[in-house]
Amino acid sequence: RATGDVHLYGKEINDETYAICKSDMMIKGNNPENIRVGSTLSTDEFAGTTFDFMLSTPPYGKSWSSEQKYIKDGKDVIDPRFKITLKNYWGVEEDADAIPRSSDGQLLFLMEMVNKMKPKHQSHSGSRIASVHNGSSLFTGDAGGGESNIRRYIIENDLLEAIIQMPNNLFYNTGITTYIWLLS
């Protein structure tokens, strides 16, 4: 049980789910204004805000091509949430492509949360993330491509705590294998 104040925040694209969440927040005495409706990828409703704990189940295989114009302008990444720096072979830092294929945005949702992590010097324990994914976040993308660079960034910055494979049939009416990514 939490000993301090707990403030809940969230964003939901589905209007019905948004309404249920907002009403649930009111019933339980939480601030319903902290729940926003819309696309997490196209607008950063909580820009500049960091969180202690973050949970998500990004949509599996959801195309984000309709939101590409908010994230990338041609070859340039324009949204700072999705910009990363990696070291090359000689140890020189370089900007790297961190944009996955437009047919699956799961890793973009993960990078959104990584962007909202508290630095360890700001909080005694930093932040913790639990995000439920299917296998594509682990296995897709070519070396040097967006998916590979995101995974590399997470590992090189020592953010990955564990990836837990869950039993099949965890979600109703599907046999998709799921994994929980734990970051801190």
Regions found by a protein language model. Name each.
Residues 91-183:
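Conserved Class I SAM-dependent methyltransferase catalytic core
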Residues 24, 75-99, 109:
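Surface-exposed acidic, glycine/proline-enriched linker/cap segments
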Residues 1-56, 60-76, 107, 134-136, ...:
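Conserved S-adenosyl-L-methionine
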Residues 55-56, 77, 97, 164:
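Compositionally biased, intrinsically disordered/low-complexity regions enriched for serine, proline
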Residues 69-84, 122-130, 154:
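A glycine-rich, aromatic-flanked flexible loop/lid motif
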